[in-house]
Amino acid sequence: MQTAEKYGMRDIHFDFESVAPEDREAYNRFLRNVKTRLPNGYTLSTTLVPKTSSNQKGKFFEAHDYKAQGQIVDFVVIMTYDWGWQGGPPMAISPIGPVKEVLQYAKSQMPPQKIMMGQNLYGFDWKLPFKQGNPPAKAISSVAAVALARKYNVPIRYDFTAQAPHFNYFDENGVQHEVWFEDSRSVQSKFNLMKEQGIGGISYWKIGLPFPQNWRLLVENFTITKKG
């Protein structure tokens, strides 16, 4: 609270990942205790992993109680990204179909205005062929991804099912790569989904990666307000 007051912040956010399943109720109690102690004018929010059912198995999922947290906190940020991740095979980072399924489940557990859809500002560059145990894929910004495609003079393709751009190239050592990232088309599809689902807003990971088209489209699609 002292840090929040020092910098004029008004939201206390908890991003606790990989919480043990047996600590699910303890985490809920912790959030209730925090909420009761917050001074007037402060909001409480949390990050949730992407789930599609209340009984979804796996230690990554079980401790995140959508219904309870939807009752306790002022809003949640759902990590609707990393289907394609550094340690897995090449694929879209936030394919539109799975993202929609998560948002629909979240809406069944809490008021839609409390839901913030997570949106990645990054992509990944995988070396091929992919094998478990390979070095992790390299994170790359959207601007850097387009520059890379231009450097190697390769076409950028678009997966209409996932609503995501991607391309392949061979580097100077003859190693083939596969890149998935975000562009204006993929982001617009997410904005359309947000409107369709009637959720509260969007949250980005991570701020600082260059993606100018996103900010232009954000202003074109929504009325941006700044509180405080």
Model regions: which residues?
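Conserved, mostly hydrophobic/aromatic
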Residues: 14, 76-78, 117, 194, ...
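Short acidic, glycine/proline-enriched helix-loop-strand junctions
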Residues: 22-25, 29-36, 40-42, 158, ...
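Glycan-binding loop/region signatures in secreted carbohydrate-active enzymes
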Residues: 121-190, 219-228
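Short, acidic/polar
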Residues: 1-6, 58-67, 182-195
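Receiver (REC) domain switch/active-site residues of two-component response regulators
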Residues: 10, 74, 200
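Acidic/aromatic/glycine-rich contiguous surface patches that form carbohydrate-binding/processing clefts
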Residues: 187-228
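Short acidic, glycine-rich surface-loop motifs adjacent to enzyme active sites
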Residues: 12-18
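Substrate-binding surface in catalytic domains of secreted glycosidases
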Residues: 21-151
